[in-house]
């Protein structure tokens, strides 16, 4: 086989692979999710919902007075991560725990205008607006895992609103990591189409 024939064959194979990667995901049927129930039907009697930055945010409040503790859960968790400590901690002041976007009973938009509600900056903005709407001027932020990252970013942007910062096994990077190709790949139309299956 001639060298040019081998190159043509490799080119055709690479072209077919590229075509499969670009078009293939759209050929996978994504049925509507069955058996979905509204978040309000799944909520506990002490659950509350507040419209924050165009999202219905699920949260709970226990206790009263100062200090105010705001509990930020980790990846794949929810307000229920904190249920064992909310009651005892409420003896010291007001405890607020909320479900960050994509977790628990907080709304999960599949489409949006502008910045993704799942971005780091949107998480900080949501916490700031949640505090504003509830009327909290300063708080002790308690962040676990990815919630620790949100707490730290919030402190860096709004130090005047943070009385103390408690980080529990935080997912905090000491060097800048932008996500690079992983973030780019997850934002492609192909991955957004397949997202509900994952």
Q: What are these model-predicted stretches?
A:
Residues 143, 147, 151:
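Gly/Ala-rich beta-loop-alpha elbow adjacent to hydrolase catalytic centers
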Residues 152, 156-157, 163-197:
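Flexible "cap/lid" loop of the alpha/beta hydrolase fold
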Residues 55, 60-108:
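Conserved HGGG/HGGXW glycine-rich cap/lid loop of the alpha/beta-hydrolase fold
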Residues 94, 138, 161-164:
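Residues at the starts of beta-strands that form the adenosine-phosphate
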Residues 52-54, 60-62, 100-142:
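Active-site loop/oxyanion-hole signature of alpha/beta-hydrolase fold enzymes
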Residues 80-83, 128, 152-156:
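Short, hydrophobic alpha-helix immediately C-terminal to the catalytic nucleophile
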Residues 2-67, 92-93, 118, 136-137:
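Alpha/beta-hydrolase fold catalytic core
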């Amino acid at each position: 086989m001639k060298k040019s024939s081998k190159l043509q064959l490799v080119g055709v194979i690479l072209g077919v692979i590229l075509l499969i990667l670009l078009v293939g995901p759209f050929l996978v049927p994504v049925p509507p999710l069955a058996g979905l129930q509204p978040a309000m039907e799944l909520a506990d009697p002490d659950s509350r919902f507040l419209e924050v930055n165009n999202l219905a945010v699920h949260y709970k409040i226990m206790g009263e007075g100062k200090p105010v503790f705001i509990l930020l859960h980790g990846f794949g968790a929810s307000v229920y991560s904190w249920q064992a400590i909310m009651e005892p901690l409420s003896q010291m002041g007001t405890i607020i725990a909320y479900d960050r976007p994509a977790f628990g009973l907080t709304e999960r938009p599949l489409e949006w205008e502008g910045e993704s509600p799942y971005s780091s900056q949107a998480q900080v903005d949501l916490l700031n607006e949640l505090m504003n709407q509830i009327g909290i001027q300063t708080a002790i932020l308690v962040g676990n895992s990815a919630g620790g990252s949100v707490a730290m970013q919030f402190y860096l942007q709004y130090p005047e609103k943070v009385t103390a910062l408690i980080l529990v096994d935080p997912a905090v990077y000491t060097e800048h990591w932008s996500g690079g190709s992983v973030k780019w790949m997850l934002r492609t139309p192909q991955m957004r189409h397949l997202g509900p299956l994952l």
